[in-house]
């Protein structure tokens, strides 16, 4: 059975689709614009708390935390435009950093490869990555109706238990950077470690293993 562990970062005491493609002026890449999407559908004081085995409960808890903090959910046609603006800002902020920004429906995916993020077998954020996360945090704070899913991944070099723990520590390091210095509301975050179970390249080569050692951040609109 694939190992899956989810860690929730929560607040203490606070409680149809159309698309077109355009050229991103900052990256020169073709991107899909989803402004029409959705038109039909009308503290942590320095630590992450606990383990969740029921991710649906964790999702509802996160929504409750945002509502308790006075952050309202997005609705209908506002979602596509909101995510379009956020995508443009992130693409500009992350240009030339090695971090990619891709669109998946109404979600944004930030893929952060190992040459940007962590040294081999380490979960301490490298200085270059720290600066990248600082820029991401600044934009996230301008878009408070965005949920943040952080997933750590490892290659297959170690045993399963080691890789699972390493992926969790890496994801937690990113979350702590965003909520600490970055001051992103902790209740917006959900943190996961996937170990070696979701490779995106072959683990048979050094280059492939380097690609698989990564952190992914998925940004999702907070819907009602």
Annotate each language-model stretch with its function.
Residues 76-79, 117-125, 160-163:
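Second-shell loop/turn segments in exported
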Residues 1-8:
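Bacterial N-terminal signal peptides that target proteins for export
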Residues 93, 117-151, 175, 180, ...:
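Periplasmic peptidoglycan-binding/anchoring modules of Gram-negative envelope and division proteins
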Residues 83-115:
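Amphipathic, membrane-active segments
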Residues 23-89:
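Short, low-complexity, glycine-enriched hydrophobic/amphipathic alpha-helices that associate
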Residues 151-224:
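Periplasmic OmpA-like peptidoglycan-binding domain that tethers envelope proteins to the cell wall
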